[in-house]
Amino acid sequence: VAAGFGVPEREARAARPGTLPAGTIPGKIPGMRRHLRPLRAAAPVALPLLAALAAAACVQPPRLVVSDADRVLATTTLDAPNPGLPGPHRVAHFVYGSGTDRRRAVFRDSVAVRTRPVNGTPFLRGIDAKALKARWRYWGFDATALPRNGRVWHPDTAGSFPLVLIVHGNHNMKEFSDPGYEWIGRHLASHGYIAVSVDENFLNGAIRSENDARGWMLLQHLALWRAWAADPAFPLAGRVDTARIALMGHSRGGEAITVAAAFNRLSHWPDDARIPFAFGFGIRALVAIAPVDGQYQPADRLPPVRGVSYFVMHGSHDADVSSFNGQRTYLRATVSDPGTVKASLYVYRANHGQWNTVWGDNDVGPMGRWLAKRSLLSGEEQRQVGRVFFTGFLALTVRGDARYAPMFRDYRTVGGWLPRTQYASQHADGGERAVATYEEDIDVATATAGGAIRAHGLTQWREGMLPMRGAGRASFETNVAYLGWKAPGGDSVSAPRDTAWYEVALPAGALGDS
């Protein structure tokens, strides 16, 4: 356990001018040892591993990174079909929606199934009235008549297929985001899923405090699908498996899916219990792509993630959601229910927008013209990472195909299927036991599992909250240990053990062994 791509900025500033914080254990994050070896500095290091990865993407431009991807990703040991390749099913497509859309002909003239709007007024009450008025003037409807529009890709074959809803995040509301997930919608359909890109563009633009509305709208779409599954006149009658549902969300949509999953288990809206809930859909898995976290806090708490499997992916070069917000969601997700797992993947050189083909490589609006984009993965490379891991995760958690479990424990098991860059992964399935969470007390010498923590020769040793990057200085809501050491020869990474050490001494049987 040690640092990865970087450590919190305030710790980095504590190092000597012109140096980078360093420290890693070989084999934990392939390539990071070579990245850090030339550095000469006292080295503050944040523990545990993935929490440190979450704190920073890369502390310097990529010219300082020596990639070992050709070696690390040279083999594939997973004994299962490559989920990143097209599946065996032919894909068909249709659109459902209001049939009255003022701005998009596809939801006006091309809908195969017409839908009724829903009244979302309670979920938008906290938003500036003037901003909403201008918005509704553009769209031609208001909060009392929010449309349920969706683009559907499905297997053009007989059978019963799981349902996957995909929802975009915030963007210019006049540059429609929902077409940007056709790449994953078609891919999932070829693998035997009914994939829907949900339109929530009317919630985009310069408004805030709307993420509960985004999540609630997803559940309103699921209500349509539950009714359609029992309707013999529906185009996919008898082919929708509503007991196996997954939600996939990008950016604010990545938080909206956690909100939807939380609302799905509740009997009332937390913000106003006069509004009853009765959802109870068969949501099994959440897939979050560079999500935000904490924009909506029901009962002044972060939305819980319980009773579902959770996967989050984030890019090191994300210039929109610059901190790995989804790592905080990952940390609080529980996997105590049978069959649930959680996993995260951090992708070096991936940005925010290329997961959506409409958004592209410009993460920060007009200012994006000054970004050095040569360091980014190409859009197709970035989306191929998504095809492999999103499809593999749904195979594992929605279909129950255990052959794909190893790729979430260690991404190197599918190295031959991945674009050549660097990755860091984390996984939990309920079988883990915490040795030291640094949250049991304020004593640096105690461990969660009992026993004692001892150290020698450190220049820094303390425990504390792990902050995110950025001006807001939010935290990951988890504690870590900060360690520093200085090697006589200056190479703090490969320093001999007697320079400094840190160990957790556990009592017999602390981990269930004899």
Task: Give names to the regions the model predicted.
Residues P62-D70, L78-D79, R349-N351, V358-G512:
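Alpha/beta-hydrolase-fold serine-hydrolase catalytic core, especially in secreted/extracellular enzymes
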Residues P62-G159:
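Short conserved active-site loop signatures built around small residues
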Residues G159, S209-E255:
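Gly/Ser-rich "nucleophile elbow"/oxyanion-hole loop immediately N-terminal to the catalytic nucleophile
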Residues S160-G169:
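Short beta-strand element of the alpha/beta-hydrolase
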Residues S177-L219, A223, V341-S344, Y348:
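Active-site machinery of serine-nucleophile hydrolases
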Residues G254-L266:
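Short glycine-enriched nucleophile-adjacent loop
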Residues H268-P291:
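A conserved short beta-strand
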Residues P303-E380:
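Active-site-adjacent alpha-helix of alpha/beta-hydrolase-fold enzymes
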